[in-house]
Amino acid sequence: MIQITVVQIDNYGPWTVTPNPRRESDLQALQSRLYCDMNLQFGAHKGLAFYTRFDNIIAITNGIDLETHRRIQNSIKNRYPFTVSMAIASAETPYDAQKLATEKLQEYGSAQDEVRKEVLDIANEFVSNGYVQLAHVDINDITGTLTDLETAYDTYLSVQMTKLKLMEELKKYNSMGFFIGGDNFMCPCNGMNEKDFQCMFEDIMESSGIELKAGIGIGKTAEDASNLADIGLEIIREGKTDLQVYKLKQATGETKSSPYNYMCPI
């Protein structure tokens, strides 16, 4: 089981134009700061957040309880000119978990409802013995094939097209994909195996000419899984395996303590 939290800014659209449209550069900076905050605060508890649309953020929150969510929510209220609502859900697959969380949030009204404010609710149950499976995917030799040959915008366009194709293919497995910078994608993928990724990469290669590879990590938390996925991808990059997909799994009972994140306000 994977636990997903959907975070949504309350009544954000109307706020951006009240009493007059706000400066776009200020709004972009504010949205980026919120995403940074979400990763620092959930990350301090071994979670991981993805910006999606910036006013809606999806986080993997295995091991993070309701009280911690409430403290994060209060921290945002104290330091931002708006509030956020959160809904939490667990399921066998990432897509199903975010679907349940989204539906729970929608029960309280529209995202632009003036009355709906600081919702915090659980769709089903908190995960106690679940796991997180993440795939860290990147494009083979993007520097040699795109960055050093094409314009910055054309390279960006190729990466975004690859992202869209990857997201569409992942959804067929009830998984999700998120762009995390450069030519990298982080994919919550509970329930998928190496063969699934190989077939998916072959389809993308045939349709776009883009070659992909992936390290897959399985752990108790998003932090554990992402660290293992990063290591798996590095093994491929360094030529230590001929595999296109390399999986690592956290040993049973293995836990790693993280240094306290002093940048986290809670």
Swiss-Prot record:
Keywords: GTP-binding, Hydrolase, Nucleotide-binding. Gene3D superfamilies: 3.30.70.270, Nucleotide cyclase. Its EC number is 3.5.4.29. One of its GO terms (molecular function) is GTP cyclohydrolase IIa activity. InterPro entries: GTP_CycHdrlase_3, Nucleotide_cyclase, Rev_trsase/Diguanyl_cyclase. One of its GO terms (biological process) is biosynthetic process. Transmembrane segments: none annotated. It catalyses: GTP + 3 H2O = 2-amino-5-formylamino-6-(5-phospho-D-ribosylamino)pyrimidin-4(3H)-one + 2 phosphate + 2 H(+). Catalyzes the formation of 2-amino-5-formylamino-6-ribofuranosylamino-4(3H)-pyrimidinone ribonucleotide monophosphate and inorganic phosphate from GTP. Also has an independent pyrophosphate phosphohydrolase activity. Belongs to the archaeal-type GTP cyclohydrolase family. HAMAP family: GTP_cyclohydro_3. PANTHER family: GTP CYCLOHYDROLASE III. This is GTP cyclohydrolase III. It comes from Methanococcus vannielii (strain ATCC 35089 / DSM 1224 / JCM 13029 / OCM 148 / SB).
